[in-house]
Each structure stands twice: as structure tokens, then as C-alpha cells.
Amino acid sequence: MFIASAYAQNTETSIEHIKKVAEHANRVFPPFDFVHFSSHFFWLAISFGFFYLFISRVIAPRIGGVIETRRDRIASDLDQAMRMKQEADTVVETYERELAEARLKAHTIAQAAGEELKQKAELERKEIEERLEKKLADAEKQIAKIRDKAMQNVGSIAEEVTLGIVKKLIDVDINKETVRSVIKTANY
């Protein structure tokens, strides 16, 4: 029973609905009805006017302000970037100039140190040469003294040996002065 009454109620609603649809089926959709064209055009013009005023007075200035702010920010950023680039270029130029000066100074110092070392080495070499020449001269003097002393001894020994040889070989006595003069002429 309960199901039958609900179904019956539902069936009546469907029939009423079909009757209402049939009434409206012959009518035209209101936006497409040319009878109301002037009213539609009026409200279109008023809506467009409100939208135009709203966009021109509220939205366009805001968008313009945002665009102007963005343009100003971009210009500011470009100016700042240009300024920073100029500062960086100045720093690089200063760095390169100071580096070149430091290299030149280092080269000058190295040359001066090299020249100083050359001069010191030359002075030391000359001093050593002078000392060596002095020692060599002293050594030559000592050698000459020793040679002269040895030659004096050799001369007397040679005289005695010569006298002894001559006496043994030919059994003749010779004068010492004769032997001495012969030995001197033979040595020099």
C-alpha cells in the first residue's frame, strides 16, 4: 500500500509537468524574442556603461599603476645594474693598474737585487782573486827561495860530484873555480 500511494503521487506530478511543458512549448526563449529587443538593448547599454565606468575608473588605473610601478622598478634595477657595472669596471681597472704597478715594482726590486748580488759577487771575486794572487806571489817567492837555496846546495853538490867523477874517470885534479863556472853556464 505504501508503495502504491507514492507511485500514484509521482504519476500525477508527471502528468502535471507534461501539461506545463506543453503550455510553454509554443513560446519563444525570451532572450531570442524580438518583442523585447528594445528592453534587452537598453539593459545591454546600461550594463556596458557600468562595466566601462568600472574598468576605466577602477581597474584600468590599478593596472596602469601596476605597470608604472613595474616600469619604475625595472628602470631602477637597470640604473642600479649600470651603476654596479661601472663600479665593477672601476674596481677591475684599479685592480689591473695596481697589479701592473706591483709587477713593475717587483721587477724593479728583482733587477736591483740582481744587480746588487752581481756587484757583491764581483767584489767577492776580486777580493778572492787579490788574496789568491797575493798567496800565489808569496808561494812563488817561497818557491824561489827554496829553489835558490836548493840550487846553492845543488851547485856545491854538483861541484863536488863533478870533481869526484873527473878524478875517478881521468884521474886529474881540476880547480873548483873552473868546475863552478862550467856548472853555472850549463844551468843558465
UniProtKB/Swiss-Prot annotation:
Membrane topology listed for this record: Single-pass membrane protein
Transmembrane segments: 35-55
UniProt keyword annotation of Transferase present: no
Compartments, as annotated in UniProt: Cell inner membrane
Keyword Glycoprotein listed: no
Keywords of this entry: ATP synthesis, Cell inner membrane, Cell membrane, CF(0), Hydrogen ion transport, Ion transport, Membrane, Transmembrane, Transmembrane helix, Transport
CDD domains: ATP-synt_Fo_b
GO annotations of cellular component type: plasma membrane; proton-transporting ATP synthase complex
Entry GO MF terms: proton-transporting ATP synthase activity, rotational mechanism; proton-transporting ATPase activity, rotational mechanism
Top-level lineage group: Bacteria
Subunit and partners: F-type ATPases have 2 components, F(1) - the catalytic core - and F(0) - the membrane proton channel. F(1) has five subunits: alpha(3), beta(3), gamma(1), delta(1), epsilon(1). F(0) has three main subunits: a(1), b(2) and c(10-14). The alpha and beta chains form an alternating ring which encloses part of the gamma chain. F(1) is attached to F(0) by a central stalk formed by the gamma and epsilon chains, while a peripheral stalk is formed by the delta and b chains.
Record-stated family: Belongs to the ATPase B chain family.
PANTHER family named among the record's database cross-references: ATP SYNTHASE SUBUNIT B, ATP SYNTHASE SUBUNIT B', CHLOROPLASTIC
Function of the molecule: F(1)F(0) ATP synthase produces ATP from ADP in the presence of a proton or sodium gradient. F-type ATPases consist of two structural domains, F(1) containing the extramembraneous catalytic core and F(0) containing the membrane proton channel, linked together by a central stalk and a peripheral stalk. During catalysis, ATP synthesis in the catalytic domain of F(1) is coupled via a rotary mechanism of the central stalk subunits to proton translocation. Component of the F(0) channel, it forms part of the peripheral stalk, linking F(1) to F(0).
The name this protein goes by in its record: ATP synthase subunit b 1
Species this protein is from: Bartonella tribocorum (strain CIP 105476 / IBS 506)
Protein's gene: atpF1
